[in-house]
Amino acid sequence: MSETTTFNKSFILIGLIALFVIPELNNVHYDPQPQFWAEMTVAWAILGLFSFILWRSRERICIPFVVLPLGLLALYLCLQPLILANIDFPGLNYVSALELLLCIFLAISISTIKNTYGLRYMLTSLSYALLIGAILQTLIGFIQYTGTTSYFGDMIFYDSSHPTTNIFGHFGQRNHYAHYLSWGTFGLIYLYQQRRLSAKLFYPLLLWMSFSLTISASRSVFIYFAIALIFSGSFYFNKRNHESKRLFCLIACATIALFAFEYFYPLIHKLFTAHNNFSSGLGRIDSESGTGRRGVEWDKAWLVFKSYPIFGYGWNGYAKQSVLLHPLFPNAALNSGLFTNCHNLILQLLAETGLIGAGIVIFGIIYAIYRLLRRSASVESVILLCMIGTTLSHSLNEYPLWYMYFLAGLVTFLAMDKPLAIIGVNKLRALATIPIIACAYLMVSGSIIFDTLVNYYDTPDDQATFTKQAKYLQNIVDHNPLWAYFAIYTLDNYINVDSDTTNKLYSLPTQYYYTHKLNTFHPYPDTMTKEAMLDWKLGNHDAAIAMVKLDLIAFPVYKSSFKDTLKDPQYKELYQLVK
């Protein structure tokens, strides 16, 4: 890069904070895509960091290996709609491909920084960013835990309807919160290992992080720290030097602290809050089997893969198959919502992208990890393995990599291997300028569209405004593939069967067309009922009956809601099915 090293390093740290701290602090969660603004912030941070690296570098840019699987998967997702006829919303393939393109930009940026200033500098800067972010999230989590969110107005995101599961920072999910705090804890350990923090600061912070992980009530943290113990223990027994011993002891200390807080949590709980609704990860392990519902979804994903082994059923196509296959599992736990993801990265990829997509990802990750370790394991590579292990083990039980802020983290970790290639900066500038401008344009225009979708999500009362907004949404569904799904998700609110405002705007066949289009992609319980009602009114009685029966089998917890929706005498036969 340029000669002004101090300026470069300061901007790089700011860039990492913009990437790993600011998006995660987002407290705005609006339908039709609650994490939109957090993910958009990640995208802008990546674009800014890549542009800075590209135009501050004097000579060479480094290309890490992880760029290859990212590029191949992006290409395959773009080609999949041409190969498979059953992809209802190809724009979602293109959006994911654009996200992977941004990840390529990020990987190149991280590799170039690491190759310029060294792995230790890169990981130190990353650890500072993750620690800052984790501390801020724990403060938010503590406010949620103590029930004092009312003092902060809308600044703190809070779900008052779930008093035992709302300790999730600004992630909205406790396992995502614990995942991020685990990254921060490993960053804290690395900074102390490198003597960047004093013992007076390290140990109180370690205890605070352990407490925060405990009140999140995530069971996955035990897996994360068990994996970290295995990695650091193997490193110590292979090296048997002071550095490896110190790292192993620190991770063991963190693990013991976590178990201590988990075990004594019922006593600690009384110090901070008066309510008796509490749980911890250890308590949840003792009281729940935990994987029963996920196991059914894993079985479904495997069945989908067996039916579509090469190309997969189609990107984002699992949700439909999950509902259609549900009758095969009569003893499954009750579903309170639609599973759009089977909660396992490998099975999800096998089901939706087949051996081609899954092979690209699995081989890419394994070989990237191998490249991190193939010369000689170091403290830095072990810390990176701990962070990677956290993300991958979480991905075997949920879907964190479907969020840009976690995907960006994994790409960052994997991009710290030895560069696969080094190219002249002028060549990359020529190649990247148009994609950068195109991404920026799509991000600006997409933000405007999303803001409009949020404003239009709740239907207005007057017919003129209702018609205007519905026509806007309909136009996006019909002509903007990148936003068609989110627009039809919003338009669904405007299609209310037997409503005068809807009937004045759309004929029954038109109502059916858009309801069916959404329902064949993401069969939500209320949308299935709506399609059944429209089928009935159009004279397709057998289809209506079949749809209600499937709805009842897949979502029995909503039986009372179905009865309320179908109580009109004209749907008497459908109503009888849910009595």
Predicted segments, located by residue:
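TM-adjacent membrane-interface loops and short helices in multi-pass inner/ER membrane proteins
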Residues: Q173, G295-F339, T353-I360
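Transmembrane signal-anchor hairpin modules in multi-pass inner-membrane enzymes, especially those
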Residues: M1-V95, L101-L131, L191-K200, E243-R246, ...
